[in-house]
């Protein structure tokens, strides 16, 4: 078994892995975890869905990046997000988009069911789209979940505040191994 670290949509992949094979997961570290698509993100998805075949996908990606990471101190994360998007083709973007549009039932299940696996959420205090849902889940999943919120930090915590993120994750894993 191993410790798994996932950022943003990667947290969904780790949680699914833990659902399917809990014996393989020693702990889960979720950075910028997505546990619920809030009202803004739902609107964002609907707008994107309307324009995904009309607008160049890079325009939509830039819009998403700015909405999810709007502040000046999120610029590095925004640029990383956009530069990675440039490596995708329109077809791949549409597949990614369909995946995110269909994720709600899975996220609801994750919020309702607590796994008996230590779970450490590391979130940015400025992650207005996803932090509220994580706070709620941690308050309900008290047996296995804990949360650390990084000040002056947005959604992509491992980029915005890499040093703090790494320090806290290593501390958590060390505690799990003792």
Sequence positions of predicted segments:
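Short beta-strand/loop motif that positions the catalytic acidic residue
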Residues: 115, 121-123
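Conserved alpha/beta-hydrolase catalytic His-Asp/Glu region
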Residues: 39-41, 58-113
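Acidic catalytic loop of the alpha/beta-hydrolase fold
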Residues: 125-130
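Short alpha-helix in the alpha/beta-hydrolase fold that links the catalytic acid
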Residues: 117, 131-139
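Alpha/beta-hydrolase fold nucleophile elbow
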Residues: 1-8
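Catalytic active-site module of serine/aspartate enzymes centered on a nucleophile-bearing elbow/loop
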Residues: 144-178
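Flexible "cap/lid" loop of the alpha/beta hydrolase fold
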Residues: 15, 19-20, 25-55
């Amino acid at each position: 078994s191993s410790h798994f670290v996932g950022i943003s949509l990667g947290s969904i992949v780790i949680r699914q892995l833990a659902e399917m094979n809990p014996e393989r997961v020693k702990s889960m570290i979720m950075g910028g975890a997505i546990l619920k698509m809030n009202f803004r993100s739902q609107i964002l998805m609907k707008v994107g869905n309307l324009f995904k075949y009309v607008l160049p996908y890079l325009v939509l990606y830039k819009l998403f990046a700015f909405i999810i990471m709007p502040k000046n101190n999120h610029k590095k994360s925004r640029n990383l997000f956009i530069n990675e998007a440039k490596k995708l083709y329109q077809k791949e973007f549409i597949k990614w988009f369909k995946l995110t549009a269909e994720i709600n039932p899975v996220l609801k299940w994750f919020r309702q069911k607590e796994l008996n696996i230590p779970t450490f959420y590391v979130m940015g205090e400025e992650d207005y789209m996803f932090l509220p849902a994580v706070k709620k889940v941690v308050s309900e999943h008290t047996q296995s979940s804990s949360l650390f919120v990084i000040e002056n930090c947005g959604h992509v915590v491992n980029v915005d505040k890499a040093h703090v993120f790494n320090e806290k994750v290593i501390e958590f894993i060390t505690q799990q191994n003792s």
